[in-house]
């Protein structure tokens, strides 16, 4: 069995300046001059290494070669992890095959993670699903990217019911709408909260918090590096 291979040349989608990417903050921390490219892992060539080739080949057999080509936008091996970047219209079909095929048997979805890449034009919002096969002791990840102006992804609740609260949290914090979810409401923020707090375009601010009788001002009103 070969070791997993590395990814190809990373895809540079932007440049981040300063420690937190903030501008005009009066930061005197010494990190204001940092310049760092924002990079996403590139697609990986064959052989992928480990059990990754077997998983990809079996998935292609399970859904059909034509459907596989239409479903999988890119195969990425990064940090010894297999990520299948899936077109959103095919997400449910791919997840069903990964769960039900005896040679795959990814019975468990460990959650949903949202990510916001403002510089990834047309693909600003990402949802990642780590999957685990208890039968075969394997792990992979599915990832779907959608644009800011059309943040819809089919819900995987019908395939993996355990994503119920995870999809609600991702909707709450990132604004990704999971079509078909039985009750897609906020789960941590108040129902009338404006915006989605973990997006990178969410303004720094907040509401005062009482703690042991003292009132702590929101972040934008605290003294910081000024």
Swiss-Prot record:
GO molecular function: NADH dehydrogenase (ubiquinone) activity; NADH:ubiquinone reductase (non-electrogenic) activity; quinone binding
Any single Pfam family the record assigns to this protein: Complex1_30kDa
Documented EC number(s): 7.1.1.-
EC top class, as a word: translocase
Record keywords: Cell membrane, Membrane, NAD, Quinone, Translocase, Transport
Signal peptide interval: none
Localization of this protein: Cell membrane
Protein name as it appears in the record: NADH-quinone oxidoreductase subunit C
Organism (species): Mycolicibacterium gilvum (strain PYR-GCK)
Annotated gene: nuoC
């Amino acid at each position: 069995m070969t070791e997993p291979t590395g990814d190809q040349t990373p895809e540079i989608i932007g440049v981040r300046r300063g420690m937190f990417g903030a501008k005009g903050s009066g930061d005197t921390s010494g990190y204001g001059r940092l310049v760092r490219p924002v990079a996403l892992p590139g697609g990986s060539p064959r052989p992928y290494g480990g059990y990754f080739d077997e998983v990809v080949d079996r998935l292609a057999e399970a859904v059909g070669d034509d459907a596989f080509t239409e479903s999988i936008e890119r195969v990425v091996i990064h940090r010894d992890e297999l990520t299948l970047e899936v077109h959103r219209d095919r997400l449910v079909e791919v997840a069903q095959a990964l769960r039900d095929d005896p040679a795959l048997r990814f019975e468990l979805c460990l959650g949903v993670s949202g990510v916001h890449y403002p510089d990834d034009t047309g693909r600003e919002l990402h949802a990642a699903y780590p999957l685990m096969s208890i039968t075969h002791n394997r792990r992979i990840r599915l990832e779907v990217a959608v644009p800011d102006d059309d943040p819809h992804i089919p819900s995987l609740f019908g395939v993996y019911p355990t994503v119920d609260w995870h999809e609600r949290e991702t909707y709450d914090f990132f604004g990704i709408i999971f079509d078909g979810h039985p009750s897609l409401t906020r789960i941590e923020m108040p129902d009338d909260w404006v915006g989605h707090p973990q997006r990178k375009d969410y303004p720094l601010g907040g509401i005062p918090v009482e703690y042991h009788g003292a009132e702590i001002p929101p972040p934008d009103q605290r003294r910081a590096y000024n």
